[in-house]
Structures are given as structure tokens and as C-alpha cells.
């Protein structure tokens, strides 16, 4: 193998070298075929095939090709050149199998032709291909390692997060605390990635991240610096703290809120206890009153907060169970002219959507003051007995009745027994859904309480009795819906035989309205109104008018009375007064004379009240309500009887 380079040196005139085709790579096959066709002859090819000297010619051809390849691989290493003769021998054998002549120099070119596939491992241009495998083998771990590290590295500076770097910075300090600027300096000095990012332009991003992480993680605490004008210290939380984001808190909804389920459970228990209380017999008026939804005993203290949200102006002493429910004013100083309008109204009216004008806006303060003066009269005590009896009315429940005996009554004259004026819960049945009809204009008109006809003596006796407090004979006023000064006019005071009898609440019906021993005078008045073509009977108190009674000062106070609670008469007669103006009718005592001139043109603007919506949405909410709109009883005339109606007061 050492002789091959010497052959190259001694034979510089090797013929194929100056040929152009030997310098090209790879050698074009058409040119090689053309040279074979021009230089070779069929005879030598045939002779070579049969001549025994073909092996010698192949050997000489292989030697020549070896010299040729050695000239091409002058820059090759010795070990690479040692493999060349074998490759060339294979090429020569391939050329001999094709029938090329070994004696002619032309086949050397043919020998060169099969060599082109072989030179890649031996030629100078083929040196890079062996190198890349070794280089790839050597660089493989180097190239693969960055990819592995890049996938495992969390940040450009390494696997440590900002919080970890801040922790190392604080721990590296002697006092275990650093200011924000000192943390910046430690980052630039200690972390190679931030060494060239200390200027203001390139540091804005990572400094912001430092501040963000200091505030985000609870493991870092901020300590106020004692010096003035110095930034705070940042220290590690001695309790540890969390170094990650806290879990998101979802907004409470009806699905995942446990408070909603608890409130529903409490409401169910409260309703069950209320029903069990209704089943038990009542031994006192209070036990009977607790059956009513409007009763003070039917609401717990928790309900008052709910009622106050609907009626924020409920600030009277009737808004608490322990409040003193009395028509006698105990605090007159805090009663302003604008607060006299506060009257009791039924609980169903508490959920009326429309805002109604207050009574003080349409009333005369002087008349109200006169009424207060009459209510504050002093007189001798009277006896008041409370009894419980069953009402003969078919629709009446067992209700308390009250007997009122004036001390000055003679033995011959029968004492007016007020047990006839029973108050019960009216029986009602659902009202069919019918469109609202109004007989008059859409504006709600209000009448006036023309006259309060009663004897001052009887009024005095009632108000100054030594009997139990008046709240024993009062209606079960819902404390949540009573207005501030409901004790003035809204309490259901039983006055003399000719006195005004306010309603016992919206659910009360007056059973027997006439005193058989009373002296009556001819004359009566009526009002009729229709809602959906059906007449609704109002509860009327027909009280005797004696000749010895004097009139109180006329109270010219228009009262708003919604007709949303139809009452029924189960007594001697009905004094029906109905009128339809969006569910509000004229209220008051009506005589043959004309109304005062100041009440004729009184109309309240901007009053909307859809009776159908109230009946369907509000009244049907009560479980104990049962509506029954029967035919109106025939109107029976009572001579010169005074009419009062159930006052369903509407708040302002």
C-alpha cells in the first residue's frame, strides 16, 4: 500500500487527467457511453471475453485506476486511501462484466464510471460526509441537552421563579430584610441574566414582575421603615404563608349558596309552626288574633326586618309587638302636621306596587287637630268586658265580642250590647280572571268623611275607662304595615252607638250593625260601584242616631279606600257603598245634603291601582284567604242611619 503514492509520482502523464470529463463529478453517463462507442471495437470486446489474459488486463486496469484515484485523493488520509484499491477493484470487475476491453486505455474511463458511486467514502469531496456522522455523534448530546434543558427550565435565567429569587435575595442579606431597590440590585449582581438589564429601559419589565410577586405572595410581608422618606422593608413571613395564587372564590348563587337553603328551611319550619298554632283552640282574643296573617302574634322579630324593607317609613309604636296600640296620643309633641295621615291598612295593601299619595297631602291639618282634641277628652271610667262567642254568621269564625256598658245607663233602658258587633275573618273565594272595567273616568276620585256623628259623652267614657288598654279591643294591626301615627285614626275604636266604627282590618266583616233599641230617623244614602260588572258589598256600620247626640266638628279628610277587599254582610241589612275608580271609591258619611264645596272638585292625580293585579298577585298569596263574590244583598233602608265603611288605609 505504501507503493501506491510512488506510482503516482512516477507517472505524471497519466492520460485521463487532462480530460475534461475526469474533472467533472459525477461523470456524465452519455459522455462515457459515447467515448466507449468511439474508442472501443467489437472485436476486442469479444476477444476479451474469450481470451484467458482478461484477468491480467483487469489487474493492470485496476492498477491504473488506483493511480488515478490516488491523484484525486491527494488530500485524503492514509487510512481512507487504503480502502480505495478494493473499491476500484470492484469497479474494474463491474467494467469487465460489461465486456469492456482491458488493453485499451478507454476502458479506464469506463472504470472510472462505476467508481463515482464509490468515491463518496474516498474522494476529497466525500470527506465531509464521514465527518457529519462523527460530528453528529459528538454533538448529539450537546444538541439534545439544550432542548432538554429548555423544556425543564421555567425561565430564561433558570428554574427559579421570581418568588424564589426574591427569597434568596432576602435570605442573603444580614438583617433578613431588603428594600425594593436593594432587591433590584441583588438581581443585577447575582443573576447573570439580569446583569445587562439593569438600565431603566430594559429593567421595566422584570422590575414590575418583582413588585407583582412581592404583593402577590403571602410569604413576603411589608414592614414600615422607621426612617422618614424611606421605602418599606420586605421580609419573609415567619408564619410561612403561601407562595402561590389563592383559589378563586366563586360568586354565591342560589345553587351553591348554603344560606339560601337554610333560609328556606327556616321558612318551612315557621309556616309549620304557624299552622299548628292555628289548629289549637284559642283561650283568649290574643290566641284568636294569632291565627290571622295580619296579627302581631303571627310575625316573629325576624319578619320585621323584611317588612321594613317594603315599608321603610314604618316607625310608629305599632311596628313592634310590645308597642302601645291605643288611640290616645301619649306623645303629641312629635306629631307633625304631615304625620297625621299615618293610618292602618291591611297587610295585603302592603305589597301594592303603585305609590299612593299620602293623606297629609289631601287633608286639612286643622280638621285633624280638632279630631285629636275630641279624642283626648277626659271622662269617668267605664266598664269594658271581653267575651268570646260564636258568631251566627255562616262565614264568621269564632271571634271575640265586646260588651260596652256606660255607667249612667238607666235600669229601664237596655244597655247597648256591643257583642253584636262581631269581627271575624270573612270567607272569600277566588275571583275569576276578568279584565278591569271602570264606570267612571280613569282618575281616582275620593269622597270625604263628611260628618262624625257621635255623642261626646260616650266618646269620653270610652277613652277614659279604667279597663285594660285599648289594644285589647283593637284590630290585629300588622305592625309591619302600620304607619307612624296609626294610633290617631287607624285604630278600631268602638265608640258610642252613633260613633264611627272603623273597620277591624281588611278581612273583617261587621255582622250585626243595628241596635234594636235605638231610635232611628228616616233617610239613608247609597253608593254603588261595579268592578267587572259585579257589585262588591262594602262592610257598613249602621249606627243609631239619637236626638240627644251632638255632632262633632266635620272632618273634611278624603280617605283612600281600595276596594280590593270585598266584605260581606251577614246581618240585618247591608248598607252597600261601592264605587269604581280604579278600585277606589268615595268614603265617608253621606247625607242628602250636598258635599262641601271644597271637596267637590277634589281629585287625586297620578294614582294607578290595578285591582285585577292586586287580587291575583297580592291577595292570593295568603293561604287563609278565600274569596267569595256572592250576589249583593238587597239594599235595606234604615232611616237616617249613619254610614261608615271599612277603612283600608293606604300609606303615603
Curated annotation (Swiss-Prot):
Q: What residues correspond to the site DNA-binding?
A: 155, 162, 222
Name the consequence of residue 219 to R: Translocates to the cytoplasm after insulin-stimulation. No change on the inhibitory effect of oxidative stress on insulin-induced phosphorylations, but no inhibition of these phosphorylations by resveratrol
**Pfam families, alphabetized:** Forkhead, FOXO-TAD, FOXO_KIX_bdg
Q: What is the effect of changing residue 313 to K?
A: Little change in levels of methylation
Q: Report the residue ranges where the short sequence motif Nuclear localization signal is annotated in this entry.
A: 248-250
Q: Which InterPro entries match?
A: FH_FOXO1, Fork_head_dom, FOXO-TAD, FOXO_KIX-bd, TF_fork_head_CS_2, WH-like_DNA-bd_sf, WH_DNA-bd_sf
Tell me the segments the record calls region Sufficient for interaction with NLK. Answer: 280-562
Report the subcellular localization: Cytoplasm; Nucleus
User: Which residue windows does the record flag with biased composition (Low complexity)?
Assistant: 35-62, 134-146
Q: Which residues carry this modification: Phosphothreonine?
A: 24, 330
Region DNA-binding, residue ranges: 208-215, 231-234
Residues annotated as region Disordered? 1-62, 112-154, 231-342, 383-410
Expression (tissue specificity)? Expressed in liver, white and brown adipose tissues (at protein level).
Q: What outcome follows a substitution of residue 391 to A?
A: Decreases phosphorylation by NLK
Cellular component (GO) terms are: cytoplasm; nucleoplasm; nucleus
Where does the record place the region Required for interaction with RUNX2? 360-456
Which terms does the record give in the GO molecular function aspect? beta-catenin binding; chromatin DNA binding; DNA binding; DNA-binding transcription activator activity, RNA polymerase II-specific; DNA-binding transcription factor activity; DNA-binding transcription repressor activity, RNA polymerase II-specific; promoter-specific chromatin binding; protein phosphatase 2A binding
Give an example GO biological process.
regulation of cell population proliferation
Compositionally biased, Polar residues: which spans? Answer: 306-323, 392-401
Quote the DNA-binding region ranges, renumbered to this chain: 156-232
Misc remark: In an animal model of diabetes mellitus type 2 (db/db mice), beta-cell islets exhibit increased levels of PPP2R1A leading to increased dephosphorylation at Thr-24 and Ser-253 and nuclear retention of FOXO1.
Q: How does it assemble?
A: Interacts with EP300 and CREBBP; the interactions acetylate FOXO1. Interacts with the 14-3-3 proteins, YWHAG and YWHAZ; the interactions require insulin-stimulated phosphorylation on Thr-24, promote nuclear exit and loss of transcriptional activity. Interacts with SKP2; the interaction ubiquitinates FOXO1 leading to its proteasomal degradation. Interacts with PMRT1; methylates FOXO1, prevents PKB/AKT1 phosphorylation and retains FOXO1 in the nucleus.
Function, in words: Transcription factor that is the main target of insulin signaling and regulates metabolic homeostasis in response to oxidative stress. Binds to the insulin response element (IRE) with consensus sequence 5'-TT[G/A]TTTTG-3' and the related Daf-16 family binding element (DBE) with consensus sequence 5'-TT[G/A]TTTAC-3'. Activity suppressed by insulin. Main regulator of redox balance and osteoblast numbers and controls bone mass. Orchestrates the endocrine function of the skeleton in regulating glucose metabolism.
Q: What protein name does the entry list? A: Forkhead box protein O1
Instruction: Give the organism's phylogenetic lineage.
Output: Eukaryota, Metazoa, Chordata, Craniata, Vertebrata
Amino acid at each position: 500500500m505504501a507503493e501506491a503514492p510512488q506510482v503516482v509520482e512516477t507517472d505524471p502523464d497519466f492520460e485521463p487527467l487532462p480530460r475534461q470529463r475526469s474533472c467533472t463529478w459525477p461523470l456524465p453517463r452519455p459522455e462515457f457511453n459515447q467515448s466507449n462507442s468511439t474508442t472501443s471495437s467489437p472485436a476486442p470486446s469479444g476477444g476479451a471475453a474469450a481470451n484467458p489474459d482478461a484477468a491480467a488486463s483487469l489487474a493492470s486496469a485496476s492498477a491504473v485506476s488506483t493511480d488515478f484515484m490516488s491523484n484525486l485523493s491527494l488530500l485524503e488520509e492514509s487510512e481512507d486511501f487504503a480502502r480505495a484499491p478494493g473499491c476500484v477493484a470492484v469497479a474494474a470487475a463491474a467494467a469487465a462484466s460489461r465486456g469492456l476491453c482491458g488493453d485499451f486505455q478507454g476502458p479506464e474511463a469506463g472504470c472510472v464510471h462505476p467508481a463515482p458511486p464509490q468515491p463518496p467514502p474516498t474522494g476529497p469531496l466525500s470527506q465531509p460526509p464521514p465527518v457529519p456522522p462523527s460530528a453528529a455523534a459528538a454533538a448529539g448530546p450537546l444538541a439534545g441537552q439544550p432542548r432538554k434543558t429548555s423544556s425543564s427550565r421555567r425561565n430564561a435565567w433558570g428554574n427559579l421563579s421570581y418568588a424564589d429569587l426574591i427569597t434568596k435575595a432576602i435570605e442573603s442579606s444580614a438583617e433578613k430584610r431588603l428594600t425594593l431597590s436593594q432587591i433590584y440590585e441583588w438581581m443585577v449582581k447575582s443573576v447573570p441574566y439580569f446583569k445587562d438589564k439593569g438600565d431603566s429601559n430594559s429593567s421595566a419589565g422584570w422590575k414590575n414582575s418583582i413588585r407583582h410577586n412581592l404583593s402577590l405572595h403571602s410569604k413576603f410581608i411589608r414592614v414600615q421603615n422607621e426612617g422618614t422618606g424611606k421605602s418599606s422593608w420586605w421580609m419573609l413571613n415567619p408564619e410561612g404563608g403561601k407562595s402561590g395564587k389563592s383559589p378563586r372564590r366563586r360568586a354565591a348563587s342560589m345553587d351553591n349558596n348554603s344560606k339560601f337553603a337554610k333560609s328556606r328551611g327556616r321558612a318551612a319550619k315557621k309556616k309549620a309552626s304557624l299552622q299548628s298554632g292555628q289548629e289549637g283552640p284559642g283561650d283568649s282574643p290574643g290566641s284568636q288574633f294569632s291565627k290571622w296573617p295580619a296579627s302581631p302574634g303571627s310575625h316573629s322579630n325576624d319578619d320585621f326586618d323584611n317588612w321594613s324593607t317594603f315599608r321603610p317609613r314604618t316607625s310608629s309604636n305599632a311596628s313592634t309587638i310590645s308597642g302601645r296600640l291605643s288611640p290616645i296620643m301619649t306623645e303629641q309633641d312629635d306629631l307633625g302636621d304631615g304625620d297625621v295621615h299615618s293610618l292602618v291598612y291591611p297587610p295585603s295593601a302592603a305589597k301594592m306596587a303603585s305609590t299612593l299619595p299620602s293623606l297629609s297631602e289631601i287633608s286639612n291639618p286643622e280638621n285633624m287637630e280638632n279630631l285629636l282634641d275630641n279624642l283626648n277628652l277626659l271622662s269617668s271610667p267605664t266598664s269594658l268586658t271581653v267575651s268570646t262567642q260564636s258568631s251566627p254568621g255562616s262565614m264568621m269564625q269564632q271571634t271575640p265580642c265586646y260588651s260596652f256598658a256606660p255607667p249612667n245607663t238607666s235600669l229601664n233602658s237596655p244597655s247597648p250590647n256591643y257583642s253584636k258587633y262581631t269581627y271575624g275573618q270573612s270567607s272569600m273565594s277566588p275571583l275569576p280572571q276578568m279584565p278591569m272595567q271602570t264606570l267612571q273616568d280613569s282618575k281616582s276620585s275620593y269622597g270625604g268623611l263628611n260628618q262624625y256623628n257621635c255623642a261626646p259623652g260616650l266618646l269620653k267614657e270610652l277613652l277614659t275607662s279604667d279597663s285594660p288598654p285599648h289594644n285589647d279591643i283593637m284590630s290585629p294591626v300588622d305592625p309591619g304595615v302600620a304607619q307612624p301615627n296609626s294610633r290617631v285614626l287607624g285604630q278600631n275604636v268602638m265608640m258610642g252607638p252613633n260613633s264611627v266604627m272603623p273597620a277591624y282590618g281588611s278581612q273583617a266583616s261587621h255582622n250585626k250593625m243595628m241596635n234594636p233599641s235605638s231610635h232611628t230617623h228616616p233617610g239613608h244614602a247609597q253608593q254603588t260601584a261595579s268592578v267587572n260588572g259585579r257589585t262588591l258589598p262594602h262592610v257598613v256600620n249602621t249606627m243609631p242616631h239619637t236626638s240627644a247626640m251632638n255632632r262633632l266638628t266635620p272632618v273634611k279628610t278624603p280617605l283612600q279606600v281600595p276596594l280590593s277587599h270585598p266584605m260581606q254582610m251577614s246581618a240585618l241589612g247591608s248598607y252597600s257603598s261601592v264605587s269604581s275608580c280604579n278600585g277606589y271609591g268615595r268614603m265617608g258619611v253621606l247625607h242628602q245634603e250636598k258635599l262641601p264645596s271644597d271637596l267637590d272638585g277634589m281629585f287625586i292625580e297620578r294614582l294607578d291601582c290595578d285591582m285585577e293585579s292586586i287580587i291575583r298577585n297580592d291577595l292570593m298569596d295568603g293561604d287563609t284567604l278565600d274569596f267569595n263574590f256572592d250576589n249583593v244583598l238587597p239594599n235595606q233602608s234604615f232611616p237616617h242611619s249613619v254610614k261608615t265603611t271599612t277603612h283600608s288605609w293606604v300609606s303615603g
